[in-house]
Amino acid sequence: MQWLTRGLPILFAILAAWFAIRQNVLSNTRKPVPPGPHSTLMRLLAIGMLAIFGYQASWQLAGFRNAEFVAFMTRYSRRTANPREGLHRGRILDRNMLIMAESKPKEGRPRFYPFAPAACHIVGYVHPKYGTVGIERANEAHLTGRSGSDVKHLRRFGQNMLRHGMVLGNDTVLTLDARLQVEAARLLSGQRGAAVAIDPRTGAIRLLASAPYFNQNQIGSAMTDPASPMLNRALNGLYPPGSTFKIFLAAAAIQAGKTGGIDCPPEGYSPGPGLPPIRDHEYYENEREGRHWRGHGMIDLSTALIKSSNVYFARLGPLLGAQSMTDMLNRFELTKGQTLFTGSDGSLTAKASRLPTLTGAPTRVLTQTAIGQGEVLVTPFQMARAVAVIAADGRQFKPHIDAEVTPQLLSAPLSPQTAKTLRALMVKVVTQGTGRGMMASGVSAGGKTGTAQNPAGDDHSWFVCFAPAERPAIAIAVVVEHGGYGSRSAVPIAAALVQAADQYGLLDPLPASGSAK
């Protein structure tokens, strides 16, 4: 095959010269020469050679826009260079046009990631052996210049093959803030967990951080790391949410008008005969110190959320009933995967959360679900998205990381009044309750802590929040694996992220157009 591709231009040149000489001889001959068998044979041979040459030229000029051709050349070409190295991939940029990925072939760097490893999971990588992932994969054709009209392809690849020029790809602009990604990487350093930030006013995703991180140019070692750095915990990590899940029960209670007093005795609440009681964290704290705790007594929803009372919400679940709980959870679409980016070659989708079937379930399932334990598993992204709904007066915008996407209102899971009431309760959690550490950010906020029991080890630390309290511009979810109390590990990280978001202008009012990249 190789001799054929190399010999075609030579054969074509010989044929062209032969036709030119023959035409010149015939034009100088006074007597017409009738076509003979040799002339017909040469014409057929010429037509065949031209057809082969045209077929080969079409592959050379436009083949690289075909993924099958690229794969074929990568496997069978004897050249030491990967075909992709002949392509100057477009850049991946953040909302401020800061470069998150670019090609630097002259410096010996086919792909360079200036903010690495801060956004490694979402930006992805390009590797000659392991392929592509993340945005690099989902938008492959766009980044390599293979998307667009056929005329554009032919012109671009014709220039590459005939003049040996570099094929220039197209840029991709994201809604992420690279500086916030770097701050999240610093805050999560040495830990396992994730942080997600969404603009509730538009659905634009500002932060998708997962830890531990990996080196985008050294993929092999990361794949065998027992800490699973290749796992995108922000989108695909499933965790019991603990007390952060109480925001859904609170929303259902507000909507149903069941926010009154429930007795929360020190001995707790048992969901059935022979089952261990569900107790409040103060009971265990006092027990460790050898003191007797009197319990919360009769408290309402506001106090229960501020104090994060497990007993209150464990009893609230059966009081609301399976149907009411199911309806509220369905409104937030927790069990549906969410597509965040649709590119030229694929999409990026957040994993769906897992919830038990509540209809017909025993009381113990309702109580465990009400406090975010049992069979409940959620992703950090889904929790950030839920808080964004509360922050946006009950409206749910389509989450996206493509800066070219126009904000799209999907639904309204909550009424404006329910969302407003719940926000006020979450603000009290920060000013009076378990989320007081959030005040260190210097920005007013509302939130909810969570300490999720983990059968495999220490409890997971959660915190979800929105800020500023008066006009929410960002919704955040943070989880730290084995971090203990939410107020201990997750809250300080969320506070630092809100402070950084304020510094980077993410909390500023939207422009008059009503949208921002």
Where are the regions that the model predicts?
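Periplasmic/cell-envelope proteins involved in peptidoglycan metabolism and beta-lactam response
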Residues: 1-222, 229, 233-238, 243, ...
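Beta-lactam-recognizing serine transpeptidase/beta-lactamase-like catalytic domain environment
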Residues: 7, 96, 159-160, 201-243, ...
